[in-house]
């Protein structure tokens, strides 16, 4: 979808649809002027409470030639004092849903004019772009009749036009990263394999002149990455370790390292999962997808940062060669791990990757993983969990999460949680009792980060949505990309 910026009077702008934001407690200039042009019908809707301006509501009207805009789409913003960037993004997303239903491929939006928030244009652009997303690559019927958005015109005052254009371009670049992450998670597991991710990394590197290295199985064996190799023993395709590096112009200091869990399909292995819902286990590489998407967006934005992405990737499958409960694996760090549950495999591939990443001497290391079902039990689908060994890093990520709507909730990481991870025959075991499962998984990872400033994001409940949300359709959300870009921009 193309983005244009216009300083036209909204009432004089010809468009298939004009989006107008409406507050519950204030009508606003554009609303009043449109109401006058339409003979008071908008005011009548408000008086009869057929449209109240409540957040999340929309109302589409045909102007019947009384305005250059063919249709008027009213979008509720709630009470003016409660307006936030997230509410603007959601309003833009609700508008996209209504426009899709009415098949308005091109439209103009006055939503940026409804707010004095400093980044209103960016919020509206992001909500609109992400709300326009659909994934229908594998559908073969009625291709010629499928709807696709073509052009969005954002209205901005003349003095702010060029700034709005630059902000909209940045929003588009961020959304390209989110869309890459969504696409990778949406593909089926027979397409996205470890080899596919390796090729996607090479293509990403080629697009933006990034450094890339893919460690193949023989190299992993030479390095001693036996935790990663152990998980991949039951898979037909060998595991890989993918390393990408973006060196932004003007970057100073040590790099930031992102580590993303890349289990391209998780059957649970010998500790096999129940059949119902197993098809969603193609999403167990959402952490890897977020790392790829963040690198894409950072490169497009030309952020002045040194950013490294590390992605351990494999499938977790049952097989005669698969690792088993009771096995002991010697990790890259030398720590020995008793396997008590082969379905606790994500932490195994991550522990080798985290130890490996220390060689870059990072200023901060952040891992993202669909790691535990316990996180979904604790937080549902409205927030990701964050845990770490550095409170300043955790606080910075939480602030970025609040700003972008990708909210984080901090869980404790006290040493007592490690008591249940002690093994009788090895240094530690990979899974303890079910209680506090998210914390225990993070405690396990903490054993492999050394003194590096580190934070862990458990995105198990937020990487995939079983329902459509205002600016995210049912399916992959691309969570983590916008949060991390905001964190990097603030550095």
From Swiss-Prot:
Subcellular location: Cytoplasm
Gene: pepA
Swiss-Prot/TrEMBL catalytic activity: Release of an N-terminal amino acid, Xaa-|-Yaa-, in which Xaa is preferably Leu, but may be other amino acids including Pro although not Arg or Lys, and Yaa may be Pro. Amino acid amides and methyl esters are also readily hydrolyzed, but rates on arylamides are exceedingly low; Release of an N-terminal amino acid, preferentially leucine, but not glutamic or aspartic acids
Organism of provenance: Geobacter sp. (strain M21)
Protein name: Probable cytosol aminopeptidase
List of residues binding Mn(2+) 2: 261, 266, 284, 345
CDD domains: Peptidase_M17
Binding of Mn(2+) 1, residues: 266, 343, 345
Matching InterPro entries: Leucine_aapep/pepB, Macro_dom-like, Peptidase_M17_C, Peptidase_M17_leu_NH2_pept, Peptidase_M17_N
Family: Belongs to the peptidase M17 family.
Coiled-coil stretches: none
Pfam families named in the record: Peptidase_M17 (PF00883), Peptidase_M17_N (PF02789)
GO molecular function terms noted in the UniProt entry: manganese ion binding; metalloaminopeptidase activity
Cofactors required: Mn(2+)
Cofactor: binding comment: Binds 2 manganese ions per subunit.
Active-site residues, record numbering mapped to chain: 273, 347
EC number of the protein: 3.4.11.1, 3.4.11.10
Keywords: Aminopeptidase, Cytoplasm, Hydrolase, Manganese, Metal-binding, Protease
GO BP annotations, alphabetical order: proteolysis
Entry superkingdom: Bacteria
């Amino acid at each position: 979808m193309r983005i244009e910026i216009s300083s036209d009077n909204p009432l004089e702008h010809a468009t298939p649809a004009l989006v107008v934001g409406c507050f519950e407690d204030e009508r606003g200039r554009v609303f009043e002027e449109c109401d006058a042009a339409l003979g008071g019908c908008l005011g009548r809707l408000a008086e009869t409470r057929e449209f109240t301006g409540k957040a999340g509501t929309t109302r589409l009207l045909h102007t019947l030639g009384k305005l250059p805009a063919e249709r008027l789409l009213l979008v509720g913003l709630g009470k003016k004092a409660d307006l936030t960037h997230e509410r603007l993004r959601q309003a833009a997303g609700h508008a996209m849903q209504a426009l899709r239903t009415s098949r308005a491929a091109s439209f103009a939006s006055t939503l940026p004019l409804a707010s004095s928030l400093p980044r209103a244009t960016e919020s509206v652009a992001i909500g609109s772009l992400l709300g326009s997303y659909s994934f229908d690559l594998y559908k073969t019927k009625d291709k010629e009749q499928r709807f696709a958005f073509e052009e969005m015109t954002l209205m901005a005052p003349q003095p702010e036009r060029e700034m709005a254009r630059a902000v909209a371009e940045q929003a588009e670049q961020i959304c390209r990263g989110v869309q890459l992450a969504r696409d990778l998670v949406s593909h089926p597991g027979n397409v996205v394999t470890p080899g596919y991710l390796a090729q996607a990394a090479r293509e990403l590197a080629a697009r933006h002149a990034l450094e890339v290295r893919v460690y193949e199985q023989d190299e992993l064996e030479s390095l001693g990455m036996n935790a990663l190799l152990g998980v991949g023993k039951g898979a037909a395709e060998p595991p890989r370790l993918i390393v990408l590096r973006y060196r932004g112009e003007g970057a100073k200091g040590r790099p930031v390292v992102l580590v993303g869990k890349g289990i391209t399909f998780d059957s649970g292995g010998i500790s096999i999962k129940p059949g119902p819902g197993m098809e969603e286990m193609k999403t167990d590489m959402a952490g890897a997808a977020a790392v790829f998407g963040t690198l894409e967006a950072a490169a497009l934005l030309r952020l002045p940062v040194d950013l490294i992405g590390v992605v351990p990737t494999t499938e977790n499958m049952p097989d005669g060669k698969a690792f088993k409960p009771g096995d002991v694996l010697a990790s890259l760090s030398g720590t020995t791990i008793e396997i008590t549950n082969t379905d606790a495999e994500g932490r195994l591939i991550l522990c080798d990757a985290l130890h490996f990443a220390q060689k870059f001497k990072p200023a901060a290391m952040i891992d993202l993983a669909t790691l535990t079902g316990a996180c979904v039990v604790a937080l549902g689908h409205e927030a990701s969990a964050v845990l770490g060994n550095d409170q300043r890093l955790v606080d910075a990520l939480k602030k970025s999460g609040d700003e972008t709507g990708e909210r984080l909730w901090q869980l404790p990481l006290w040493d007592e949680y490690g008591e249940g991870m002690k093994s009788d025959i090895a240094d530690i075991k990979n899974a303890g009792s079910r209680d506090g499962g998210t914390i225990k998984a993070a405690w396990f990872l903490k054993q492999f980060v050394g003194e590096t400033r580190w934070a862990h994001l458990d995105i198990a409940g937020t990487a995939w949505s079983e329902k459509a949300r205002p600016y995210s359709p049912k399916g992959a959300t691309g969570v983590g990309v916008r949060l991390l870009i905001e964190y990097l921009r603030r550095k």
